[in-house]
Design a protein with these regions (language model features):
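Aromatic sugar-binding surface patches on proteins
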Residues: 231-260
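Binuclear metal-dependent phosphoesterase catalytic core
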Residues: 133-206, 210-217, 256-265, 269-285
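Short beta-strand edge segments in extracellular beta-sheet folds
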Residues: 287-290
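Short, well-ordered beta-to-alpha junction loops that form the rim of enzyme active sites
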Residues: 37, 75-80, 120-121, 174-175
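Extended low-complexity, serine/threonine- and proline-enriched intrinsically disordered segments
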Residues: 210-235
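Extended active-site neighborhood of metal-dependent phosphoesterases/phosphodiesterases
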Residues: 1-68, 87-115, 123-165, 169
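Short, high-confidence coil segments that cap the C-terminus of an alpha-helix
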Residues: 68-70, 267
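Active-site segments of SGNH/GDSL-like serine hydrolases
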Residues: 70-86
Length: 290
């Protein structure tokens, strides 16, 4: 409700149709919590990422019923963390794109093995926040509001799949129309505007526990180097088609799950091997031509 004077009344219509905006339930050995971290500031469409004291008090009491050490899944819209925070560039965080009082949520989740599931941003990102705390930021199936085949970071249209076994959680990203093993894209030398001399891999579900290795003509060359830049496919697509986009502000965005390696020769065979957090290995090959 955009014509109300405060956040307290902004969900009246939603609640009348769908019920509460925060709640919890158990399924199997997992405790699930849904939170509402969009705080409407009663000015146009503007909001900030914020958990009200009412929700924090409720969550504190809710978690008292959960055995310490068990797995808790917490879902919300706006992410708690950001790429700026990971780089310790705190002043560059946008109040509209991150939960501003996240430290108080983290404190409540300390006794548990917690997975935070969020969205909002049109890219895929994962944050290992602590040994027991992990945040999954999900790229939307709609990519760039249905304007492109990829999200702004080059993640193909798709969805996350989570597999629960007792208190254990495994996950992978499933691209629409692609096999489960399609977990990264490999670009040839010259495709990347940031690393023109290198082959580049976009590993969209990467986190710090993954390994990205490369081989040239079968020789192990070690790990590829991670860098920030634009995914070649979405960048080129937006350059060619952005004039037809419904929303003119849409475009490619810099991502941090890119990796590069510079081949020694121009006609070598390149193989990239990606190992995920579960030990699954994904491989792609590319034959270079002079």
């Amino acid at each position: 409700d955009l014509n109300v004077r405060s956040n307290e009344h902004a969900r009246t219509t939603y609640k009348s149709y769908y019920g509460p905006t925060y709640y919890s339930f158990n399924r199997g050995d997992i405790h699930y919590v849904v939170l509402d971290d969009i705080f409407f500031i009663a000015k146009s469409y503007l909001y900030v990422g914020y958990l009200t004291e009412q929700q924090l008090q409720w969550l504190e009491q809710d978690l008292k019923q959960v055995t310490p050490g068990s797995t808790v899944v917490v879902a919300m819209h706006i992410p708690t963390y950001s790429r700026e925070a990971r780089r310790k560039e705190w002043g560059k965080e946008s109040t509209m794109k991150v939960m501003n009082n996240r430290s108080h949520l983290y404190e409540l989740l300390k006794p548990y093995n917690a997975h935070i599931m969020s969205g909002h941003e049109h890219y895929n990102e994962n944050y290992v926040l602590a040994d027991n705390l992990y945040e999954h930021v999900h790229a939307p199936l709609s990519t760039l509001f249905w304007q492109a085949p990829w999200a702004c970071d080059g993640t193909p249209g798709g969805y996350a799949v989570y597999e629960f076994d007792g208190g254990k959680v495994n996950w992978y990203y499933k691209c629409v129309g692609k096999d489960k093993d399609y977990q990264f894209e490999l670009y040839p030398v010259g495709a990347s505007r940031n690393k023109k001399e290198a082959v580049v891999a976009n590993v969209w579900n990467y986190d710090s526990t993954w390994k990205v290795k490369w081989y040239e003509n079968g020789i192990d060359k070690g790990e590829m180097i991670r860098f920030s830049g634009y995914d070649p496919a979405i960048y080129e697509y937006c350059e060619k088609n952005s004039s037809t986009f419904k929303h003119k502000y849409l475009g490619a965005d810099i991502t941090e799950h890119l990796f590069y390696a510079v081949p020694e020769t121009k006609d070598s065979e390149i193989r990239v091997e990606v190992t995920d957090h579960c030990g699954n290995v994904y491989t792609r090959k590319m034959q270079q031509s002079k």
